[in-house]
Regions:
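Short Pro/Gly-enriched beta-strand edge/turn motifs at strand-loop
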Residues: 2-8, 162-171
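Loop-rich non-cytosolic ectodomains and luminal regions
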Residues: 70, 104-165, 212-219
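Noncatalytic luminal/extracellular "stalk/propeptide" segments of secretory-pathway proteins
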Residues: 1-75, 79-87
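Solvent-exposed loop/turn segments at secondary-structure junctions
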Residues: 12-15, 61-62, 82-85, 120-124, ...
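Second-shell loop/turn segments in exported
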Residues: 23, 41, 45, 52-57, ...
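Extracellular/periplasmic catalytic domains that process cell-envelope and extracellular macromolecules
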Residues: 15-16, 46-50, 68-72, 108-110, ...
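Catalytic-core environment of secreted peptidases
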Residues: 1, 68-70, 74-96, 114, ...
Length: 220
């Protein structure tokens, strides 16, 4: 057998809350509902939501070049597309995930009031992809979310046309004290080298809005 065991471990307890709501409103009169999901670990917006202009970047260097004068009081929109030419798609994912993970931290350094990121998805569709993000001590915490690739294209096109685009956005997520969970451990002891170890790992948990079948049920 596999000698299954459970190992107690404390894990973060973050709750999404009510369904997120977002709209974009442009100076040219466009108003479109945006498909949005709070990033795991994000704070909420104010209870009444927030509204601020969007400024688009693709890289950390873009943030640095724009500086606080251009960014302060705005929502930073990280719009780096995944590269479809990589055969191993994790390479494309790995290049873009830095903005989801640390975008709120880096944007806040320049006075941004929020951060949104293009979903890490090679397709153009209406489905936002959540994922983990982080905050750092001594850096202001700002809300962070992912928008669908279709909505990312709409926002980017409007900005490219020179329009002022504002995001009206509300999310109510919150973080509670850590809660107990378990690592699941299985062991198949070899016959030839029973005291040597080959370690394989994966995750059985999934995001609250997913089913976990392919991330990472299939992987496990």
């Amino acid at each position: 057998g596999v000698n299954p065991q459970k190992q107690a471990v404390m894990v973060p307890h973050w709750v999404r809350g009510e369904k997120e709501v977002a709209f974009i409103k442009s100076s040219g009169g466009t108003k479109v509902e945006v498909n949005v999901l709070a990033l795991g670990g994000s704070i909420a917006t104010d209870a009444d939501g927030m509204m601020a202009p969007i400024i688009e970047v693709e890289t950390w260097e873009d943030l640095e070049e724009l500086g606080e004068e251009s960014i302060k009081g705005k929502i930073v929109f990280f719009n780096e597309e995944m590269n479809p030419e990589n055969i191993y798609t994790l390479h494309s994912y790995g290049h873009c995930v830095q903005h989801r993970w640390a975008g709120a931290v880096q944007a806040a350094k320049y006075g941004a009031v929020g951060a949104i990121v293009r979903s890490l998805n090679l397709r153009i569709d209406e489905f936002p992809h959540t994922g983990s993000m982080t905050y750092e001590d001594a850096i202001d915490t700002i809300p962070a979310a992912a928008i669908s690739t279709r909505d990312a294209e709409i926002v980017s096109d409007l900005l490219a046309e020179g329009e002022i685009v504002e995001l009206i956005w509300k999310q109510s997520c919150q973080t509670f004290p850590d809660v107990p969970s378990h690592n699941v451990i299985g062991e198949i002891r070899g016959s030839k080298y029973p005291d040597e170890i080959i370690l394989l790992g994966g995750h059985l948990d999934s995001w609250d809005v997913g089913h976990g079948a392919h991330d990472d049920g299939a992987g496990v």
